[in-house]
């Protein structure tokens, strides 16, 4: 029989590979192809008609990985309702099913692994109907109308069933033998959101494979002795949202693997010393929203595996100094309590502590040694308290401190001295900081001045700064390659209140002649550019009469450096006539007078009268040989070639020119004192050769080293591969064997479901216990 079923399944899979979703089915359902079958969603359609179409096209459909029929007008499940179909997951949620026949699942028993029947009107557990599903792994009966589980409704012998969800029903009583037939396979039981007033200890006792037990949102008032007995692998117990007043230390016996314990939303009033000492593997303890008034000494000590402790929304007003001794807590939440002071050593004995929250308490003072032992602290929340000051060096030992929240306190000034130089962020919003307190950034524990940032104190408007005025700069690229004309500074005329008012016109006040230039943007100018810094002195403006008009500045001839070189080279090889034609008439002194009342552009050459030079004389060339006499009228750096004194034309008497002609001298073409060009070229060539040789040698050495490393790595990999072939084959065979075994048992993906530790969270939130949505 099994061989026939396997052949039928194999043939249907072959046909399915050619045409997975027939057109008739796609018209009524949403069909998608997966790795080993199809997924059908036939919601909002008649279930009877859909199943008839699937049976007709069973040869083409093959294995159905998931069949969903939500809101499919189902009221009951008649006998053989799914016969002839190969379905692995059946979802019949959100219908109005009240009755399930004992033979409703007949015909699909070989492959059915999961049945979802939540959000229906089922009043009893369909134990007889489930008895024909030996391969069932998961059963969801949540959000129904089950009131109690009687003896005839206990779960049948299902050796692979590991997940039962009975949450959100009306269960108040469970028979002792409810889970007796599945005690060797059951791993998760959800009985949350029911009406139980006591822990069903007799029903869950001795479940050796039970890992997660959810009893949240019931009416349990107390934990009696031996409530949780012989649960060796239980790692999650959820008792949140009940009415528990006191924790009995004898309630947990032989529960060594408990890692997550949820006790939030109860009415626990006190904790005793060493109350949780038996939980050697406890990693997370949630006591949020209880009525705990104090944490006595050693009540939470000795928990070497505890990482997260939540004590928010209680009435804690006192914490003993040794309450957390020898614990490895990383996240500690004590927000929304009644603490008024943080004494010295309040969180001592916590070397791994990283996150602490004292938000929304009544803290007024903090002892400077309160956090001395918490050297690994990273985040501290002290918001919504009544702090008026923080003593210096309070957080000096916390070198890893990144965030301190001091919002909504009563701090009149910034407590800079309380932190070390490595603090990352300090939040100070909603504090009554005094008006003289300048807030600024911190860098290495000191204030950082931000350039161009205005200081706003007591709501005073910041002083406006003058906007920079850009002065156009003439670059060399704008100068023509031809011999330019005279380059002169533009004339500048500054009028002071010279505008007269006529009629109703108001007098126009001229703006300042010069503004300061933003030097920060002009520091990267090329060396050859000119940069003018123009200032607006207010004292000078007041000294000028209203009707005075300043004399315009005379143009100044500023020949460029190229013109001077070109002119000197031309003068050396031209005749006397060309010298006369190209000579220029330059006044002996500048016309600019040192007048402090005149606003001039800066810099201006010869702002003051220059030094007096030696008197120059004219030299006339004669036919008689004579010794040339050198007059030192030029700087010593300019040499005059001997015997090449040019002749300068005599001034004409008819022209009646009052200006003087300055004699021009040809520059020396060569000198014995100057070094020749050949040694310089040889020295430059020698230096360049040395540089090229060094660079080439370095490149060759680098290439050889890289090649050697590549060859060594290749040989190492080749050597390792010679020994890894056999081990890789054995590993692949082992993985394949485990996969086949898990496929037969169906529990491979469930073993580690609750082994993963949840991510550390700063605040659990309001819906942290809604494990089943």
From Swiss-Prot:
It is a single-pass type I membrane protein. It is found in: Apical cell membrane. Keywords: Cell membrane, Leucine-rich repeat, Membrane, Repeat, Signal, Transmembrane, Transmembrane helix. LRR repeats lie at residues 61-84, 85-107, 109-132, 133-157, 159-181, 183-206, 207-230, 231-254, 256-278, 279-302, 303-326, 328-349, 350-373, 375-397, 399-421, 486-516. Residues 711-773 are cytoplasmic. GO terms for biological process: embryo development ending in birth or egg hatching; epithelial cell development; nematode larval development; positive regulation of membrane permeability; regulation of tube size. The keyword Hydrolase does not apply. The keyword Ubl conjugation does not apply. In L1 larvae, expressed in a subset of epithelial cells including epidermal, vulval and rectal cells and the excretory duct and pore. Absent from internal epithelia such as the gut and pharyngeal tubes. Transiently expressed in the excretory canal cell at the 1.5-fold embryonic stage but no longer visible in this cell at hatching. InterPro entries: Leu-rich_rpt (IPR001611), Leu-rich_rpt_typical-subtyp (IPR003591), LRR_dom_sf (IPR032675). This is Leucine-rich repeat-containing protein let-4. It comes from Caenorhabditis elegans.
């Amino acid at each position: 029989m099994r061989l026939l079923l396997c052949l039928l399944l194999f043939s249907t899979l072959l046909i399915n590979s050619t045409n997975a979703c027939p057109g008739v089915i796609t018209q009524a359902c949403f069909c998608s192809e997966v790795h080993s079958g199809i997924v059908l969603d036939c919601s909002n359609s008649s279930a009877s008609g859909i199943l008839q179409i699937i049976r007709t096209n069973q040869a083409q459909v093959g294995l159905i990985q998931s069949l969903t029929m939500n809101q499919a007008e189902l009221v009951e499940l008649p006998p053989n309702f799914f016969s002839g179909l190969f379905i692995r997951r059946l979802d019949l949620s959100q219908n109005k099913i009240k009755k399930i026949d004992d033979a409703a699942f007949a015909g699909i028993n070989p492959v059915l692994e999961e049945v979802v029947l939540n959000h229906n009107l089922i009043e009893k557990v369909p134990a007889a109907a489930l008895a024909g599903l030996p391969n069932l792994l998961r059963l969801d009966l949540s959000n129904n109308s089950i009131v109690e589980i009687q003896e005839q409704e206990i779960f049948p012998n299902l050796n692979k069933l590991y997940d039962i969800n009975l949450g959100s029903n009306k269960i108040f009583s469970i028979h002792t033998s409810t889970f007796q037939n599945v005690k060797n396979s059951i791993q998760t039981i959800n009985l949350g959101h029911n009406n139980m007033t006591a822990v069903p200890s007799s029903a869950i006792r001795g479940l050796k494979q039970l890992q997660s037990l959810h009893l949240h949102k019931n009416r349990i008032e107390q934990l009696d002795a031996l409530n949780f007995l012989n649960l060796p692998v239980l790692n999650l117990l959820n008792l949140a949202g009940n009415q528990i007043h006191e924790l009995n230390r004898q309630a947990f016996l032989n529960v060594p693997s408990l890692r997550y314990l949820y006790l939030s939303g109860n009415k626990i009033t006190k904790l005793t010393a060493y109350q949780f000492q038996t939980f050697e593997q406890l990693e997370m303890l949630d006591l949020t929203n209880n009525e705990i008034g104090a944490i006595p000494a050693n009540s939470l000590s000795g928990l070497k595996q505890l990482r997260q402790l939540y004590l928010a929304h209680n009435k804690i007003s006192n914490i003993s100094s040794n309450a957390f001794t020898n614990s490895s807590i990383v996240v500690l939440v004590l927000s929304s309590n009644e603490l008024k002071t943080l004494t010295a050593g309040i969180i001592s004995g916590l070397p791994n502590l990283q996150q602490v929250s004292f938000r929304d308490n009544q803290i007024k003072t903090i002892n400077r040694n309160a956090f001395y032992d918490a050297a690994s602290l990273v985040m501290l929340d002290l918001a919504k308290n009544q702090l008026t000051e923080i003593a210096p060096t309070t957080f000096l030992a916390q070198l890893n401190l990144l965030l301190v929240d001091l919002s909504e306190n009563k701090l009149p000034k910034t407590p800079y001295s309380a932190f070390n130089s490595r603090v990352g962020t300090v939040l100070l919003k909603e504090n009554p900081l005094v008006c003289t307190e300048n807030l600024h950034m911190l860098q290495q524990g000191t204030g950082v001045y931000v350039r161009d940032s205005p200081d706003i104190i007591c709501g005073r408007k910041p002083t406006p700064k003058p906007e920079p005025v850009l002065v156009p700069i003439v670059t060399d690229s704008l100068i023509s390659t031809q011999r330019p004309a005279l380059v002169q500074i533009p004339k500048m005329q500054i009028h002071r209140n010279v505008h007269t008012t006529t009629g109703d016109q108001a007098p126009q006040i001229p703006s300042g002649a010069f503004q300061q230039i933003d030097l920060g943007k002009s520091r990267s100018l090329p060396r050859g550019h000119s940069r003018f810094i123009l200032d607006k002195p207010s004292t000078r403006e007041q000294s000028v009469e209203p009707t005075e008009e300043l004399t315009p500045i005379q143009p100044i001839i500023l020949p460029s450096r190229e013109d001077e070189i070109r002119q000197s080279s031309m003068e050396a090889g031209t005749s006397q006539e060309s010298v006369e034609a190209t000579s220029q008439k330059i006044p002996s002194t500048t016309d600019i007078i040192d007048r402090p009342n005149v606003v001039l552009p800066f810099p201006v050459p010869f702002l003051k009268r220059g030094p007096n030079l030696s008197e120059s004389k004219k030299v006339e060339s004669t036919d008689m040989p004579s010794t040339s006499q050198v007059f030192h009228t030029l700087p010593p750096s300019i040499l005059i070639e001997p015997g090449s004194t040019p002749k300068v034309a005599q001034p004409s008497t008819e022209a009646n020119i009052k200006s003087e002609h300055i004699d021009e001298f040809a520059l020396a073409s060569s000198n014995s004192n100057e070094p020749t060009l050949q040694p310089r070229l040889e020295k430059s060539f020698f230096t360049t050769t040395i540089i090229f040789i060094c660079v080439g040698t370095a490149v060759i050495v680098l290439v050889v080293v890289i090649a050697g490393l590549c060859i060594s790595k290749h040989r190492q990999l080749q050597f390792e591969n010679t020994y890894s072939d056999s081990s890789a084959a054995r590993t692949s065979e082992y993985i394949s064997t485990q996969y086949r075994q898990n496929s037969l048992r169906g529990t491979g993906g469930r073993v580690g479901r609750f082994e993963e530790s949840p991510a550390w969270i700063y605040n659990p939130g309001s819906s942290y216990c809604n494990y089943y949505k």
